[in-house]
Design a protein with these regions (language model features):
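Asp-box/BNR beta-propeller blade signature and adjacent active/binding-site loops
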Residues: 1-416
């Protein structure tokens, strides 16, 4: 038999000095490609559809991004690839194999750094093709992702409510919260799986009830919207925002649904958020920043499915003037999701013509237009820099940049 060539891939094990990287001035970097084609001789499979990423930071200062590569989203050829932005580097490495199970669809990937030296990787594994009957697997790394433990089944049934969504978080109790799509359809809502023992055992607090009527003031046991982002509020409640299952506000406009749980995910209370709904080829990020506020990154509309008269959102430029902007934006809340006084389009105004890959494809970026679609994943490093990936691009910015166009500084933001 042919001998396997030795893998020369080495990851630094030196702890990164995050404090030395801290900056107070505003930072926003131009979008940088992180999904590269592998070298032809590398043996790394690379299919035409590269999508649904996850992102985390490593203790050595590297960023680790992963995504699925496949020809068909239902396909059994699917693999999960990874790329690394090494500390101090300005270019993402070419992809490497990250996770492969022969003839199994692997939809749904999440990464987490537990701030205690361990990385967690959670992934769906199908019985065959499609993404509707997944089990969930988990593995860990204590060497910055150079090696990983053997995968362990944490939700072994091939069933619904197991489609992993990037954005795993840790509550103030030290519990892990993993959101999953509750079904394969676009309006099936989302579930949460909770681990109170650092990933050893997991429970979905769902009571088995069928999908509720997602309406203003309604309650149910499934989050409104797929691909949901979940964040813990300071009072211990969970808050989620998701895609589809839109709810009409008082003016009759369809809005992104907000779900809030005061019993750690057993029941959810639904309301219309102030944000426009998102749709196919789009996924939001919802996370709490180290500095305190809650950050939402989403899109002003769907570029094809939103009626033209409903597209765009109002933003404020540096001079305090209002303008209508389109595409990916960030919003900040200083009062636990009640209001979002800071909103900024994720562009620095430079004209660019870019290919966003996956479902995004070609788009123009300028002072009034940001990336129009993409599956988002985000993380914040200990130096307080915010890192965001879309389906093909990597962005880096900080709170100072997000607040740069803030025309009115609220008392809450001053206290933060």
């Amino acid at each position: 038999p042919l001998s396997q060539p030795k893998d020369e891939y080495v990851v630094s094990q030196i702890k990164w000095d995050w404090a030395s990287q801290y900056v107070t001035e505003p930072v926003f970097t131009a979008p940088l490609v992180y999904v590269h084609e592998p070298d032809a001789h590398s043996g790394t499979p690379f299919f035409k559809h590269n999508h649904q990423p996850a992102l985390t930071w490593c203790d050595n200062g590297d960023l680790l991004a992963v995504w699925f590569s496949t020809n068909e989203e239902k396909g059994r050829e699917m693999v999960v690839l990874s790329s690394r932005l090494r500390a101090g580097s300005s270019e993402w490495e070419k992809p490497r194999m990250f996770y492969q199970i022969a003839d199994r669809n692997l939809t749904g990937t999440a990464l987490l750094n537990d701030h205690q030296g361990t990385l967690y990787h959670i992934n769906g594994v199908e019985a065959a093709g499609h993404w509707q009957n997944l089990m969930m697997t988990l593995r860990t790394s204590t060497d910055n992702g150079q090696t990983w433990s053997k995968p362990r089944m944490i939700a072994p049934e091939h069933t619904k409510r197991h489609q992993v969504i990037a954005g795993t978080s840790i509550t103030k109790e030290g519990w892990f919260v993993q959101a999953c799509d509750a079904g394969p359809g676009g309006r099936d809502g989302a579930a949460v799986h909770i681990s109170k023992d650092k990933g050893k055992t997991w429970t979905d607090p769902w009571d088995g009830a069928s999908l509720p009527d997602f309406k203003e003031g309604g309650t149910g046991t499934t989050i409104a919207g797929i691909h949901a982002g979940v964040v813990q509020l300071k009072d211990g409640r969970l808050m989620a925002l998701g895609r589809n299952n839109s709810i009409r506000d008082k003016e009759g406009h369809l809005r992104m649904p907000m779900s809030v749980s005061d019993d750690m995910g057993k029941t959810w209370h639904y309301s219309a958020s102030e944000f426009p709904p998102i749709d196919g080829g789009q996924r939001l990020v919802l996370m709490r920043l180290n500095e305190g506020p809650i950050l939402l990154i989403s899109f002003t509309e769907h570029p094809y499915r939103t009626p033209k008269e409903e597209r765009g959102m109002m933003f404020t430029d540096k001079s305090g003037k209002s303008f209508k902007g389109y595409g990916m934006y960030a919003a900040l809340s200083y009062d636990e999701g009640k209001t979002w006084p800071v909103k900024r389009l994720l562009t620095n105004g430079t004209y660019r013509f870019l290919n966003g890959g996956a479902w995004t494809q070609f788009f123009e970026m300028d002072e009034g237009h940001a990336e129009p679609r993409g599956y988002l994943a985000g993380t914040q490093t200990p130096d307080n820099m915010i890192h965001l990936i879309t389906s093909r691009f990597y962005y880096k910015f900080n709170l100072a940049w997000l607040k740069g166009n803030e025309s009115i500084i609220s008392p809450q933001s001053l206290s933060n």
